[in-house]
Amino acid sequence: VKTSRKDLYDFIVKELKESFSDLPTEKNESNYGRFTLWGAKALLANVYLNAEVYTGDPQWNACIQECDDIINSGKYSLDINYSDPFKAHNENSLENILVIPYDEIFATGFNYHLAALHGANQKTYDLVGSPWGAGAYKGIPQFIDTYDPDDERLNATWLGGPQYASDRTPLTGSYDLMGQPLIFVNKMPNGIFTGEAEGYRWLKYEVEMGARSELNNDLVLFRLTQVHMMKAECLLRTGKADQAASIVSMVRKRAFKEHPEKAIVSGAQLQEKSCYKYGTVENYVLTSQNQVYPEKFGRFYDELGWEFAGESYRRRDMIRFGHFTKAKWLSHEPNGDYKTVFPLPQKVVDTNPNLEQNPNYQ
């Protein structure tokens, strides 16, 4: 018999709560990269944030409580710069709560730059190894277009424009732009076939000059900004929009150092529709411009995108805001509500006759 989502949710919540008394509370070198009480509370807060999806029963106040415990502990604070949590040596971040430690020699496995960058960018960073092909980690132009041009998170997350070698020599293409200037542009024909320079590249984690094929950056799982934004969302969903706006404005402040007036948002603004222009794209043209998802708390949803782009939470956000299986973007067409749940790996199902494949994946 398959365990229900609610039973699994209850089990996870119980396990996390029972672990609290056994987990360390100090933020130090010995506990770095390990679950502390604060890492466990951040995970529990995230489970509570999505409780309505998992069980049908929202747990906004419970999420706020876990967030407040972390914030009031005084163990963490926001880094001065948006990029600081993602530096090559981000073990010094004031903000990161839980990470997976990596090292270019002793703890390998983090080589995202080889997938994100164009092969020619080897000369940009004097890399030991060459990136793979033309680069694959590209931003959807419809999303990139939602950024305020003065938002520092745009250039701190995405690599666009003319590409240069470390000596400032212009780089050239290797495929459809053979011998021509390599200029990353924010456009794609349809999301299926793209030219080698089409699409900004996700480059949130610092790539050091002379980096090897493995990086020294530690992969961030939870940071204090996320805790603040989880609390803000719960306040918004419980009718405290102005309190939520105060938190969001605080988070935005470091992204608008040159334009501090743009950091301020109101509770009313957070409840507006998303500014994302949903619809499929064909031959660079948006073919269906009338979809607007989500309509409720859409601006807050946009804020999550700008702050956490590429940090592996977007799918959950899309499901929680109710449009993962409804909206169209680039070449994506809605194709079934059942896809809010992943299929079980077929190899596992074949091995264990007691397991049932999730509905519609048979």
Annotate each predicted stretch with a short phrase.
Residues 9, 17-18, 34-186, 326-331:
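An aromatic- and glycine-enriched ligand-binding surface/loop that stacks and positions planar moieties
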Residues 5, 11, 86-141, 214-221, ...:
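Long, intrinsically disordered, low-complexity segments
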Residues 163, 257, 261, 306-310:
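Intrinsically disordered or highly flexible coil/loop and linker segments, enriched in small
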Residues 1-5, 26-27:
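A conserved hydrophobic secondary-structure block that centers on an alpha-helix together
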Residues 160-254:
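C-terminal substrate/ligand-recognition segments
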Residues 170-197, 260-290:
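Charged, glycine/proline-rich intrinsically disordered loops and linkers
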Residues 73-82, 243, 260-261, 311:
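Acidic/polar loop patches that form or flank catalytic/metal-binding clefts of enzymes
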